[in-house]
């Protein structure tokens, strides 16, 4: 069981980490929001296939609006903000900002569900936000990279998705059902950009189409399935969630290998503060 948890968890974070540099590759021929539509559509198709094989249940009609809220936050809103943000960021910087999402989720959950956060947890949260400020202000107040603002927005909307996931889970839906129906709803909401997406798809090279299919099928579909499986085998949730800390490191390495990106000193300093804060928060803060 331990080996299964390790293997499935690592596979999930590896796939998620690869989405940062490969989104930048896909953006060489796709614009941000049409890319989001195509990625969500590919992911929805793959999740429907996985769901069929796993015999997932259909959602109740009265819950469909909740799936639209969930998909609107976690996939429509996330794709728009994430894809726009990463245009002007390195894979490393983007992945570090997104890594703050669990802390944002814990803050919201502490208010909604009255979950206690210890004083050391609040100290870790404060330190993480200092790390974000270092990233934002490293080049000076007047040269804040707008991509960072968009990516903080992506972390916030994904936090909203996490809270919705929890609500749907309490209603009896399992992880695969939640991500499948949320992804379908997210793709439908991105349908306004279907025309642009299909037009760009028709003119794209084979290598960029492969990058697009990879993004949809693996980080957006398979990784959620393997993450859910890892959770089901784990004795404690933290056995799985602690793997999230590896994502920025992996995406930095992949960004260097695939795109020859070299992060600036601000990314290393701010990033180190953020990652240490997240580790402390998860180990001691709750």
Predicted features and spans:
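Glycine-/small-residue-enriched transmembrane alpha-helix faces in small-molecule transporters
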Residues: 1-37, 140-167, 186-192, 254
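Hydrophobic/small/kink-forming positions within alpha-helical transmembrane segments
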Residues: 14-17, 21, 48, 72-76, ...
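Specific transmembrane alpha-helical segments of multi-pass solute transporters/efflux pumps
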Residues: 15, 19-20, 51-98, 134, ...
